[in-house]
């Protein structure tokens, strides 16, 4: 990890922290919730060893990157704006893009807004979500899963923060990263995050050192910036009306664990495998379903994910 360089740049009105290693064509890695650049530690080291420059920012609201106060500052347009500005600041014209969880959502929007900056995309866990002009995102999730669904619970500023503050931060990360349930996460108001059982032991792919890194950073920053992505999701829906029906026009490989909760959302498998996904993403070249893998697949199965990323981007 010592070879990873940590830089801070100005972009789109914020200061952004980026982990960077290697030389060659650039691979931009976008983390999810509740994560950091650190989630890509295995991919950063691997990609740099096979001839790429791998860069992984702390996204807006996370880690050592600035965290604007207003939830309205966290739309996909803001986040993609940060990333375009970062590439400009670093003198990078085009990248291979890799996203996971919220990073995957941002990656889909990056490809919608600025396909000219993307050579190819490898996305993990979250398939493309076509915009339904009649139903905002959170309303759709509320209809499908009810008020206790975690995205719905995260909407009111301060509520989730209060819940998280009542739990040891390291314990919270153990519970989040090790949750192997494929059921939609529901957080009843009276119980909150304690509704998800903590693991008895850490899995082999996660160490106490890893947990402590996440916990230390989030103790410094709190969770508000990260939660604001959910609070701005419907504003993103509103502002992206011009892209209703637009297709993703970059080459794509999609990877998901067969035990990933996102893969078990109602309609997800049908959309991914029965033609809907390919219609919205016409340059979708491959869908990989990884057996016995859960949501944090880039950390749980790093060697497989490294190989899948390299095999795809090596074609271009």
From Swiss-Prot:
Concerning InterPro entries, the annotation shows: AB_hydrolase_1, AB_hydrolase_fold, Epox_hydrolase-like
Q: What residues does the AB hydrolase-1 domain cover?
A: 25-302
- State if Hydrolase is listed as a keyword: yes
Q: In which pathway does it act?
A: Secondary metabolite biosynthesis; terpenoid biosynthesis
For the ligand (an epoxide), the binding residues are 150
The alphabetical list of record keywords is:
Hydrolase
Q: What tissues has this protein been observed in?
A: Highly expressed in young fruits 15 days after anthesis (15-DAA).
Q: Does the keyword NAD apply?
A: no
Query: What EC designation does it have?
Result: 3.3.2.10, 3.3.2.-
Q: Which reaction does it catalyse?
A: an epoxide + H2O = an ethanediol; (24S)-24,25-epoxycucurbitadienol + H2O = (24R)-24,25-dihydroxycucurbitadienol
* Marked site positions, Contributes to the formation of an oxyanion binding site for the epoxide oxygen of substrate: 150, 230
Q: What class of enzyme is it?
A: hydrolase
Q: Name one GO molecular function term.
A: hydrolase activity
Q: Kindly identify the residues recorded as the active site.
A: 101, 230, 295
**Role this protein plays:** Epoxide hydrolase involved in the biosynthesis of cucurbitacin and mogroside tetracyclic triterpene natural products (e.g. siamenoside I and mogrosides IV, V and VI). Cucurbitacins have cytotoxic properties and exhibit deterrent taste as a defense barrier against herbivores. Mogrosides are nonsugar highly oxygenated compounds used as high-intensity zero-calorie sweeteners; they also possess pharmacological properties such as regulating immunity, lowering blood sugar and lipid levels, protecting the liver, and acting as antioxidants and antitumor agents.
Q: What else is known?
A: Mogrosides, the major active constituents of S.grosvenorii fruits, are a mixture of cucurbitane-type triterpenoid glycosides that have been proven to be powerful and zero-caloric sweeteners and can hence be used as a sucrose substitute for diabetic and obese patients.
Assembly and binders: Homodimer.
* Record family assignment: Belongs to the AB hydrolase superfamily. Epoxide hydrolase family.
This chain belongs to which protein, by name? Epoxide hydrolase 3
Q: What is the lineage of its organism?
A: Eukaryota, Viridiplantae, Streptophyta, Embryophyta, Tracheophyta
As recorded in Swiss-Prot or TrEMBL, the protein's gene is named: EPH3
